[in-house]
Amino acid sequence: LTLGKSLTPFPKDANDFYHITKANDSLFARAACRNWNLKIIDVMQSTVFGVETESTKQINEFTRFDYDEIYGTVLNRFILQASANLPLTIYGGGKQSSGIMVLRDAINVLNKLKDFDIHSGSYQVINNNPKSYKILDLAQKVKNAFDARGKDTVFNTTDFDPRNESKNNSNI
């Protein structure tokens, strides 16, 4: 399936349990459109980082901050590791790339889509991946930001890759 300039595997493919659930969600949504004449827009977004939007700044509320030690949210993991004075762990050499976008940009795209008109029984996929970064470059950006604030941040680079990906994988 070609959408604009990007090639999207269809049916979706995944190599870990989390992303398999995402692929299944899309298949279920598509079946619901066919069977019950629903309108569904499936938004595929980059990894989202950040904790505030224009709305939350005005009412002094917080959004959630997700991270884990292996899957996804690599930028958040680096920020937490640096905050805790831990080395930034870079799996597989850091040449892999990942799409990253700021929370407020993700919200802006979703707000624009609320008026997107599709017909009943239609399933539309929107890919929102504005920019990709090498994992090592993200780690360097976090290191630079924390070093500028007086924290001596170091890397822990390991060949071990818990996601079992190619060291040069550009499709994270």
Regions found by a protein language model. Name each.
Residues 1-46, 74-84:
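Active-site Tyr-X1-5-Lys
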Residues 6, 46-51, 96-97, 131:
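Active-site pre-Tyr helix/loop in NAD(P)-dependent dehydrogenases
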Residues 25, 71-74, 135, 168:
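Conserved donor sugar-nucleotide recognition element shared by glycan-biosynthetic enzymes
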Residues 1-3, 55-59, 168-171:
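Short, flexible, mixed-charge acidic loops at enzyme active sites
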Residues 30, 52-55, 135:
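Short, function-defining helix-loop hinge/capping sites that tune catalysis or transport
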Residues 23, 36-38, 48-76, 86, ...:
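Glycine/proline-rich active-site loop of Rossmann-fold NAD(P)-dependent oxidoreductases
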Residues 13, 67-71, 131:
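Residue-level signature of the cytosolic catalytic core of signaling kinases
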Residues 82-172:
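C-terminal substrate-binding subdomain of Rossmann-fold SDR/epimerase-dehydratase oxidoreductases
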